[in-house]
Amino acid sequence: VAETHDHRVSEIISKKFDVVLAGGITFENVRKIVNSVKPVGIDVSSGVELNNRKNELLIKKICHNLI
């Protein structure tokens, strides 16, 4: 999983600009990040990988946590 950053910076930027977030977004943190930053999009590529392959269960968990 990629490293994430201090999303307080993204919160400030997203008040003036559309933001797409990437890096370190997982099923464990996606809801908190989306609720605080309110991005127009997210890239969860590395956050849904297990052993360098996309993992169906991790994809489902991220989707479930966004509902």
Curated annotation (Swiss-Prot):
Substrates-to-products reaction catalysed: N-(5-phospho-beta-D-ribosyl)anthranilate = 1-(2-carboxyphenylamino)-1-deoxy-D-ribulose 5-phosphate
Q: Name one GO molecular function term.
A: phosphoribosylanthranilate isomerase activity
Q: Which GO terms describe its biological process?
A: L-tryptophan biosynthetic process
InterPro entries per record: Aldolase_TIM, PRAI_dom, RibuloseP-bd_barrel, TrpF_fam
Q: Does the keyword Amino-acid biosynthesis apply?
A: yes
Q: What class of enzyme is it?
A: isomerase
The Enzyme Commission number assigned here is: 5.3.1.24
SUPFAM superfamilies noted in UniProt: Ribulose-phoshate binding barrel
Pathway assignment reads:
Amino-acid biosynthesis; L-tryptophan biosynthesis; L-tryptophan from chorismate: step 3/5
Q: What are the alphabetically sorted keywords of the record?
A: Amino-acid biosynthesis, Aromatic amino acid biosynthesis, Isomerase, Tryptophan biosynthesis
Give the UniProt family note: Belongs to the TrpF family.
Q: Which PANTHER family match?
A: N-(5'-PHOSPHORIBOSYL)ANTHRANILATE ISOMERASE (PTHR42894:SF1)
Q: What is this protein called?
A: N-(5'-phosphoribosyl)anthranilate isomerase
**Which source organism does the UniProt entry give?**
Methanococcus voltae
